[in-house]
Amino acid sequence: MTRRIDWRGTDTLPDRREVLHLQGIPVGVEPSARVVAIFDAAVDAYTETAEPRALLADISREAFAEVFRGEGRNAPVTPIESVAARAGALALFVATVGARVTDRIRDLLAHNEPALAVMLDAVASAAADRLTRRLADRFDRAEDPASRSGLVTLGYSPGYCGWHVSGQRALFAYVGPDAIGVTLNESCLMHPLKSVSGVLAAGPADIHQFTPAWAFCADCRNRTCLTRMRQLPALERTG
């Protein structure tokens, strides 16, 4: 089954600290009044232009194995294969905050407002990432809450954890995100730019635990897996 989800822009606003961190301001550092004013203006621009929407498609382990195989360009061994094999439920997703946000960023740059453009870009990036968490919550609620007690749902995306970015093609073929206006270019980059895709895996918290010591981990700049693993105990309690 494939479900479409639509949100209001205000439903997907990221936390200010998260956005400012993307701007290079460390957590715990109080931003200046000017930075706060620019952030507030960026939030207004985001809520005015954002059109957040997503498709969520249930998939079996066997079907996901085919999608994940894609064009055969993945790393020889990846944590995603282990996660999927142990997950109780899987779903593919594609989500976007829409093209109007990116259009507004371009307009701001064209009108010599780089500070607001860069802040809006950070707001939109953080909002797009937040869509994955919202979809995970939706995926949890779609099942019997009693059967999901203590389980954790996390997302994994092409381009990360050994899943080659060309895997987008098989994922898109399965989900059909043209229905929400999301397409791929020849390099497998998504349009609109502020979009996310991947697989949601629901299962006991320990399926998401691994040591990031694969060769491809050396190319990862943010290591968000470490942050997610540190948060697993709290996520398990609320699952």
Language-model segments: residues:
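Conserved mixed alpha/beta catalytic, RNA-binding, or beta-rich assembly cores of soluble enzyme
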Residues: A87-G155
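Short cysteine/histidine-rich zinc-coordinating motifs and their immediately flanking basic loops
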Residues: M229-T238
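Conserved active-site and cofactor/substrate-binding residues in soluble primary-metabolism enzymes
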Residues: R34-A37, A41, A126, R130, ...
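Structural signal for hydrophobic packing residues in well-ordered secondary-structure cores
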Residues: V43-A50, F139, E143, R221-T224
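Active-site helix-to-loop segments that bind/position phosphate- or nucleotide-bearing substrates
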Residues: M1-A117
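Short terminal or interdomain "cap/linker" segment that borders an active site or interface and mediates
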Residues: A146-L226, G239
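Intrinsically disordered or highly flexible coil/loop and linker segments, enriched in small
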Residues: E48-L56, T132-R133, D144-R148, L226, ...
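Generic structural signal of hydrophobic/aromatic residues within well-ordered alpha-helices
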Residues: F39, Y46, R104-I105, F139, ...
